[in-house]
Every structure is written in structure tokens, then in C-alpha cells.
Amino acid sequence: MKLIVAITGATGAPLAVRLLEALKHIPNVETHLVMSRWAKTTIEHETEYSARDVAVLADVCHNASDQAATISSGSFKTDGMIIIPCSMKTLAGIRTGYAEGLIGRAADVVMKENRKLVLVPREMPLSTVHLENMLALAQKGVAMVPPMPAWYNHPKSVTDIENHIVTRVLDQFDLDSPFAKRWQGIHAK
């Protein structure tokens, strides 16, 4: 399986790091990473990682301005793309087909090739414009996986919450997360 992972500058960089760490533990998954300019800043602000540290978690790292990268073409076969976190600017660009930079172009390619596109939108509160953009994309088959915590699994830390969100993202590709804590029913503890 080949997956594109894109990181935008929206808050939530630890989720992207955790996703890449999870994908490292899943056999036969090749990751292609793209980080926006602001993603690099956000990574260094929100985590203990540098952008370089995050880049080495991926199999291939592409420059966000390289419109000639392999992932900018539909003839380069991938199984889909995850944008985590996804800024509202990026989401709006995807909705309108404005393929600025490699993240927008790769998302456009994934959509036109009818491959799986998963967005982890990061904003609060949501405006009607945000909601309309998300609805329009969802109606086109794009999966919206907002990073919402679950309380049924009794998280003890922020890492537990991140693990749950990453598990739900990986579920979109039918990949088993090494961090999964699955619902076992109300009486199971």
C-alpha cells in the first residue's frame, strides 16, 4: 500500500507525528510525506520534534512546492491520501480544485483518480463556510475525520486521545493501528 500523508500548518501536529509512527509499525505500507511551510513551524512549536525528525518517519519526503513530484501525477499509483491536520485554507482549496502547491495538487489527483482522501479538519468553532466546504467534499466521497476525543475508552493521557484519533484515521484504509483500543461493549472493562 502507498499512502500520501500531508501535514498543514493547522494546530494538531502531534496527530501527524503519531500517525507516521503508527504507519512505521504496519507492514507493507509506503508513506509519501508532504509538509507545508507552516506545518514545519507548527511541528516545532507543538512537539519535541524538528521537521527533519518527522521527515525521517516517512519512506519518501516531498518538497511542498515540487509540482513535478511523483505524487502530483495520477499515473503514480497510490491507495490514497491523509491530510492531518487539515487547515480550512487547504480544505477550501481542495473543494474548489485550487491545486496550489503539492498538497493541493496531490489531493486533486487523488480525487480525480477516485482514490481515498481523508481529511482531519482542525478548527473550532466551525463557520458556515467551513461546514459547507466539508459537506461538499463529503458528498464527493472525501472522508471527514475530525480529531474528536472518545471518552468510552477512558483516556488517561493526551497520547491516549491521539492514539484513538489515529486509529480512527487508519480505519478509513482498513489498516490495524498498533495503538487501537476497540470498543468491547458497555460491560467489558
Model-derived features with residue positions:
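A cross-family phosphate/adenosyl-ligand binding-site feature
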Residues: M1-V118, M124-K189
